[in-house]
């Protein structure tokens, strides 16, 4: 064998080993949460027990603050007009972090407002995920910079970071003057416009809130900004003392979760919530692909007498592979007593959970392995019966526009559909 061929063979072997390592790092990690157990007592604390809140705080690192004012901001009609008003009123700081952005009316309106406030000497920071917002043009970002907006991209793909290419920042953050916060599943794209009941208008759940929980949302932004730029944002400009003051009756906090070895805060949150429900458990999620452990927790909840219902997307989904992978598990869940519904009018993109009409979450976190293990995610958790009742009401109203999946009928689907579902489920670790 010639020297050139030997060199080529060595290079080929190195490349194969490198790709194998990347694949291994991508699809494997430590042991996730499989059960929530206790010893010598009655079991995991219900959401109505004060120990539940303390346990959640200890296991996720999220503090649930008293003194917040939280409001749902449903669909584009519910979030954008209020968001534009709050941004235009900013006097000191605006921090925006978005995963998904596309050119259009929404992105243009955001740019116009951010430029105007930056020219008014408000410090404006705009952070986007390099993959999710790849369609924002250089001219768009340069236009922001020229007006004084500080712009950064998070996790741009480099050859030396390729093993982390699947780890995206799926977070949605808007904070105005350290006092008003927004999070949820929305982005900067025109298909979030509207009421969520028409084909081209996505169904979305978001929240607008004031109070100490906003400081946690700001801290999540600061962590991401530091990752991208090396600048850790602190001080009274971003974290004013007045931002920690009580402004309402609601207990709430921001769960910010990121990839790690072993179970993630996202998984611990889900496991505690599924185990803490005693009466009702209403889950709305666009990408619902529960793994073996979470399916067992859902089935155990049914055995405890919990009314477990899942609302997910229909064939109007934007990611068919994930939809098929989720449907692969319908028979098991339906047989165990979990009720499953598919939203009919349009793409459902909401990510919410309500347990016992008391413990709720609204945010960016999907019910799949990508959100649990790969992505940075944010969601507002709320411990409040009034807010929980409003979440229950929205969930039940959404069921009016949904089709319940019945086991007998579902079993009659074609062999072709079953095959696609099985093949899609094989990729669940990456979805």
Tell where the protein language model's regions lie, with residue ranges.
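Charged, low-complexity intrinsically disordered terminal segments
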Residues: 2-431
